[in-house]
Amino acid sequence: MKKTLLDKLYIPNSCKVSRKLFKKQFIENFSLNTSEKAIISEDIDNITLEYLLNKDKINITPFSDEENDYTEIAFIRVELLSTKRLKKLSNIIQYIPYPLILVFADENKICINISPKRINKNDSSKLVVEDSYFTEWIDLDNSNQIEHEFLESLEIKNHPFTNFFEFYSSYLNKLIAFNASQYSGSLEQNEDTRELLRKIQEVESSINDIISKIKKESDIRDKVNLNIELKKLNDKLENLKTRLQG
């Protein structure tokens, strides 16, 4: 059998589960709306709980405080029929009530999602997603040098066994460094990397909005003003990229 990316992380066999999760489990166990049920039914080929890490299976200490509950971590592989609603699908799978590392597979391409969670202040038995981070799609048969280095960095030996919070955060930091590398050209990061990447993505979104408005605008004066605004945003973007490069 061909090894998947998760197999290549060299997680101990004691953590291996390889248990298929059925679509009906999501429909029956979570309060999904009609749209979410359609996404589960139409977009997933297979979903498998590949590895489950807890203190009984691996020498990593659980971590919990008033805001966090990292007592176990699951690695889940999702084979897709469609990638069009990926982020919505990820949101549904993240209803599973513990920290997850999701690997979406579309034939030979993969996308990784990591979504740190905190304890719901209104119901301490529940976790809510703080933010959700995705890699771009990586072609495993045609990966470039940085993609290859990133995938190697995901091997379990490259992450701290201090506790599950530090362990999970390390995976998140690797993902953020990879996303930043498309601007910096390197997997190196510093304490400002996450914030700079967030600002870059915000500016890029604003640039796309302005470009769309320019295409639709018929008034010459308004179009000129929009182009001036676009120039300022592009300058800001270049400045942020330079800062990210260190």
Model-based region annotation:
Residues 1-120:
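N-terminal, leucine/charged-rich tether regions that mediate assembly and partner docking
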Residues 3-8, 67, 80, 145-153, ...:
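A generic structural signal for ordered alpha-helices
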Residues 7, 43-45, 56, 65, ...:
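Acidic-enriched, low-complexity/disordered segments with a strong bias for Aspartate over Glutamate
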Residues 17, 78, 103, 128-129, ...:
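Extended aliphatic helical segments
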Residues 88-93, 97-185:
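Extended assembly-interface/linker segments at domain junctions
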Residues 180, 184-188, 192-246:
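Alpha-helical oligomerization segments
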